[in-house]
């Protein structure tokens, strides 16, 4: 019974991965086509394209790990192989989280309205701030990789140079739990906190702007209010998805009887996989150009389908 549930869980994750590939691939394709057509690309589209690439990389890495765990569940992996697996997981997750945080930071600096001189200074240099934030994140990536490699070197020696590639094994679960502690509690929490901060500051900016409108007896929405609401709608979904992702990934760290159950671990992984896949759908729906293109593609597919079905019955 446990084996059947694990297979179902793996199947659901694979479906989520396929949806994520299509969603993020669509973002990359549309933005690249507009880039070629117009011979220029905006900063927000650069971030969106890079974010979509990082999500494709993350989902591909997760898919490879799942496939390998199913096909080769009882083989021994060497120190180098463990490091390669962990490096790709850390790197893909790092850029996925930090690029999403940079996107939120970009929206915040572009749309929020504060009279503070520091904010005004950063607002005028929004592109440099975003680039600097992304470059600074590479320092955290280096430290993260260094700490985890040191841990792997120390632990693999205790396991006589090899580790069983079996995620149902208590030894393997304990080994990867410490890696989750280092990656999630220390490093992934930084871009997560940045995203939450920009989201809260956007809400505060909208509240202040709304108060000013009431003082001037303006009841209708202006352009700035609409921009706030549009971005907040996208960011609310991102905050919810990232919070669920962070929560269920962090739950695998807890040392209790529930976390010794491999089925609960699989459930956490299934829920966590919703974030990189579901967020791509949110980004498509929140961007006017991407949404219109997506609806045009759906209309074209529907039109082709209505033409194809009668021909099929005529045969």
Curated annotation (Swiss-Prot):
What protein name is recorded for this chain? Taste receptor type 2 member 129
Q: What else is known?
A: Several bitter taste receptors are expressed in a single taste receptor cell.
**Membrane topology of the entry:** Multi-pass membrane protein
Which top-level group of life is the source organism from?
Eukaryota
Per the UniProt topology annotation, the Extracellular ranges are 1-9, 68-101, 150-185, 255-266
List the GO molecular function terms: bitter taste receptor activity; G protein-coupled receptor activity
**Role played:** Putative taste receptor which may play a role in the perception of bitterness.
Localization: Membrane
State the family named in the UniProt similarity comment for this chain.
Belongs to the G-protein coupled receptor T2R family.
The record's annotation in InterPro entries points to: TAS2R
- Could you give one GO CC term from the UniProt record? membrane
Indicate the segments annotated as coiled coil, or none if absent: none
**Which residue windows are transmembrane per the record?**
10-30, 47-67, 102-122, 129-149, 186-206, 234-254, 267-287
